[in-house]
Amino acid sequence: MNPWRGLGVLPREVWYVCLAILVNRAGTMVLPFLTLYLTIDRRLSVSFAGITLTVYGIGSILIAPLAGRLSDRLGALRIMKISLFVSGLLLFIYPFANNLASILTITAAWAIASEAFRPPSMSMIGDLAGAMHRKAAFALCRLAINVGMSIGPVVGGFLAMRSFKLLFYFDGSTTLLAALLLVALPWRIKSDAGSGPQNGESQIGLHAAKKSSALYSDVLKNRRFLYFLLAMIPVELVFFQPIAAMPLFLVRDLHFTEAGYGVLFAVNTVIIILVEVPLNMSMSSWSHRHALALGAALVGIGFGALVFVNGVVGAVATIVIWTFGEMILLPASAAYVSDVAPPEQSGAYMGLYTMGFSLAFAIGPWLGMQVMEALGPSAVWLGTFACGCITAIMMWLLPKRSNAVQQLEQNG
């Protein structure tokens, strides 16, 4: 049986979104190398690098719920185009920031523009795929992300050895190219009345306009969803160490080169490219509770094992472990949110879900680097192990579906 065959049932609009994500991520190199850019090229302190990443995270927090609401009101596709165009332009401007205040300002603006893409893209994928195919759709989305990420950081590592400014120009160019793809692709969906195809953006926008204008206070009444968001926070803090404590540990303490770090970063993405979709297709019958608990546990074990690492082989082994956790946890968590969200509030639910990652981005990199400076890298990796275990236990205790949610999932 071909485990990839299930992707063939996904609507072509899902593939369009994933294509734009692929192009954008193929140039993603500024964020993975931002800590090294600030500390090596700009000769700024580790503390300021942590503050800069925190500012990015705060921008992400501010935009996530707003982007979700705008997606429900104005249409996901429109918000995605604006996000890519603005963030691409800001990347070209970033290298010209010549003082601390301007670096923080443009970082905040870039974060808001860039992170506005995620809630509408995830909401759109979940809506178009339907309940039966959401795990496959989100696995395809992550496949696109990681095919791109297998290119961006590797190329970025070699560009950084020549000039860090090249990272910004390359990243900005692919971001603008992704925006142009969203404009150029034929977004056409058959009308319900059978009157032939209609313009996809207007139909998607019309569908969004018909959605309820329920406030976030309605979403916050869903206690099961709030428990899930709370459970995700510890492991979300861990996921941002590869752009904070991990590059400092590998380059400064283990003496990897920037190019070596980029290649090592690609180990994660290559595994995901080869394994994630078949893995999630084979686990499609697993309950959310079991998949989420296993994924979080593997993430904690993988990062925690860095405490024993002193060379390339050990680093690769730990990446393999936490990558399997990532491949299980992230598609399952996105599918869970799509399943529990009422159709008219999918953007709002996804906005709060992505806001959790944004909160972790604001805290995790800064916290990881502060702990590393004060207590050493071993304390960071033991802390990541504890965070993974906390999320795993909480997910194992995740309240079961209500009958209403089960009926909603069955109806797609």
Predicted regions located by residue number:
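Juxtamembrane intracellular "pre-TM" segments in multi-pass secondary transporters
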Residues: 1-11, 189-230, 412
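Conserved MFS/SLC helix-loop-helix module at the cytosolic interface between two early adjacent transmembrane helices
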Residues: 62-98
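Helix-to-loop junctions at the C-terminal end of transmembrane segments
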Residues: 63-75, 275-288
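Symmetry-related core transmembrane helices of the 12-TM Major Facilitator Superfamily/SLC fold
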Residues: 167-184, 381-397
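Helix-loop boundary and gating motifs at the non-cytosolic
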Residues: 7-57, 226-231, 236-264
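Structural signature of the two symmetry-related core transmembrane helices
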Residues: 78-92, 290-305
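Residue-level signature of mid-helix packing/kink "hotspots" within the transmembrane helices
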Residues: 29, 57-65, 149-150, 269-277, ...
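Cytoplasmic helix-loop-helix junction between adjacent transmembrane helices
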Residues: 107-147
